[in-house]
Structures are given as C-alpha cells and as structure tokens.
C-alpha cells in the first residue's frame, strides 16, 4: 500500500523492479489525482509518470484507457525499460 496526498495506491505490476517509492513520491504531482492508474517508466535515469483511467470511466479517452497500456509501453517507453503500474484504491 502506497499513500500519497491522501490517496492510496496498490502496486499491481512491477516490471524489472521499476518501482521506487521515494522516486515516485518525489515525482508525483496533484495533476495525477484524477486518474485510476499511475504508470511510471524509467528512461535515462529519469522517472516519468502517466495517468490512465479504468476502461469504464466516463472521463477516459482511447489513449487514457488502461487497456491501452501495452501500446503505450511499446510506443513511448524505451525498449525493455523498467516500469510499474499503481492502481488507486477508492473507498
């Protein structure tokens, strides 16, 4: 369980041990509060965060649906990079 800005997240995928809680908390911005999932990927020593919505969320566009994660990783991330997926826990 990861807690940041009164939001709880669960680590659901951790490819190549990409998750680093300290780096995540340092890079997290309140603009990400609206998303159901946060994906973090590493490139050139930098952590990049991107938000995704659950597929059924009315706010989701095609590009922000979590079901497009594989395409995002393939198209926008460095080949074979470490990455992680956090799911927001709503109460």
Swiss-Prot record:
<keyword id="KW-1277">Toxin-antitoxin system</keyword>
<comment type="function">
    <text>Probable antitoxin component of a putative type VII toxin-antitoxin (TA) system. Probably neutralizes cognate toxin YutE.</text>
</comment>
<comment type="subunit">
    <text>Homodimer, probably forms a complex with cognate toxin YutE.</text>
</comment>
<dbReference type="InterPro" id="IPR038141">
    <property type="entry name" value="YutD-like_sf"/>
</dbReference>
<dbReference type="InterPro" id="IPR009370">
    <property type="entry name" value="YutD-like"/>
</dbReference>
<protein>
    <recommendedName>
        <fullName>Putative antitoxin YutD</fullName>
    </recommendedName>
</protein>
<feature type="disulfide bond">
    <location>
        <begin position="77"/>
        <end position="81"/>
    </location>
</feature>
<dbReference type="Pfam" id="PF06265">
    <property type="entry name" value="YutD-like"/>
</dbReference>
<keyword id="KW-1015">Disulfide bond</keyword>
